[in-house]
Amino acid sequence: MPYPADAERRLRAIRGAMRDAGLDALVVSGSEYTGFDGAVLYLCGFQIVHRYAYVFVPLEGDPALVFPSEARYVGDHGSTWIEERVFADVPGEWLRDRARGAARLGVYGLDYVMNVRDYRALAAGDFEVIAFDEEFDLARAVKSDEELSAVREAVRINEAGFWTVLSAYEPGKTEAEIMAPAAARFVELGTGRHAMNMVLAHGPPGGARPEFVIPSETRKVGAEDLLLYSLEIGGPSGHWAEVSRPVMAGRPSAATADMLKAYVEYTEAARAVMKEGSTAHDVHTACSKPFRDRGFQLGHVTGHSIGMTMIEHPRIGEGNETELSENMVFSMHPHVIAEDGSCLYMQETWRIGRDDGEQLSSLEVKIYDGSEG
């Protein structure tokens, strides 16, 4: 199978980052751990169904796709454009042998993705093993036109899921009953298993608590329960999006109402600062200001680059001086916590623009009461 044009571009970008880092070869890890299969899909077109896989990328020559032998009949191995496909009893041993003669071997997924037995095999080699997550992510952070089209498709699917949640919402139902139709809709629209659907709920009247939990199949929702469904999906192409808004039929608490005002201000700040030339620190500073000015705490990370892996570098945070470029894509989701322990949390996917940021969904920044669906 010939390399698609965008695949050639991706490989050139990754090899450029390898040269900059002085690597002789690179191992790219992927597993079925939700959201962490995408680096393999990005480089070779193979969708991991079960277990894990690696792409071996030499600085020169053709890459190889490596599977554990027990995964021989798991997944469509003909979907990749990489010709050399290897099934190894211990993939790390095969990778170590292929990397023989290298001085510096990079590994994407070294800390979170790579199988322990394969790391042990690699570590026994005569080369230096180097973590390469940040460099890999930065090399793929600017999206091509084809990739942006896939991102927009994922956002449309994500937004459709939110409207399905809203249509299903009714006090007296369980959290899971409200979520279930959206999960089905996501699958109908091509997400497969690429979904991370949680909820922040169980808070004081008119509020939600800050912990992410699986929607309960037994807990019935009241009108004063603020529901913050965390809707995160990967579209048919494997590109991820995160879009959600709070839902509650009753009246928000004073703390929730104040956090909502800050969220509206944050959205305008994000639009102004998420542009070419800003740094990740600039974005964090501008976006956190409406919350900090009101004395709120920020819990979960403010935002992060998002692509075919759910969470990519750069992260939006204090002290991160990575400069942003047009057509990078970020998930932004300030995790705002009030003094009474209640929380407000919304997700939005943004494109870095030349002059300002582009919010990719059409959803208003507000608390939806169910009448809109």
Segments (PLM) and residue ranges:
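Active-site neighborhoods and metal-handling regions in enzymes and metal-associated proteins
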Residues: 1-373
